[in-house]
Amino acid sequence: LLNMPIVDFLNKRVLFVTGKGGVGKSTVAIALGIRAAMEGRRTIIVEVASTENASRMFRQEEVGFKEVEISNDLWSISIDPEDSMREYVLLQLKVKAMRDLLFRSKMFTYLAAATPGLNELVTIGKIWELAQLDRKIKHGRKYDLVIVDAPATGHGISFLQTPRTFANIARVGPIHTQALQLQEMITDKEHTGTVLVSLPEEMPVNESASLEAELT
């Protein structure tokens, strides 16, 4: 449900697009990306599901965990939690020997499996990194707008609440600090927006209304 003029959405830094499965959520996310690119805004569409829609719509090969230009001023990336975790470790651990040991042991894979919500947290962390004007990765491109094709409403609520959950669990330390950063991004009404996609049917509308209530 777009309850404000589209130009207001395109002036945000981050847009989360969600809705009940099957209502055209991914199509709306891509359409917003195309419109933003036509307005001259350097835009990246972020997909968090295993199925890529943006590259397929533009008849290109799957992009994977790479920022690939699929049209003028329009990029796409598919975020894989394991790749996000690996990138996070590379940014946090400065000692190469420690990084190599961690990757060889696959410890971070076991950690993700044993920590509910960690995959979602590192995924949102990558979204945050993409939205920074001062990118953390080498040669990171600066984007005007990051459009996230977020999970459907059932998972979408818990997905967007993940940083707050981790900030409450980890009361101190880097996890707490970084989770607060992510939560601030999600709740920043000036720079972040949420687009709720629905159909004129009772169940999709009710789910969208519930999600809106959860987010406010």
Residue spans for each PLM region:
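ATP-hydrolysis module of ASCE/P-loop NTPase motor domains
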Residues: 90-131
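The Walker A (P-loop) glycine that initiates the GxxxxGKT/S ATP-binding motif of P-loop NTPases
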Residues: 19
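Conserved catalytic-core segment of NTP-binding enzymes
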Residues: 3-9, 23, 27-31, 38-39, ...
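N-terminal phosphate/diphosphate-binding loop that engages ATP/GTP or pyrophosphate donors
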Residues: 35-104
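Charged, low-complexity, helix/coiled-coil-prone segments
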Residues: 36-39, 63-77, 111-126, 150-160
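Flexible beta-alpha connector loops of hexameric P-loop NTPases
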Residues: 82-83, 110-119, 166-174
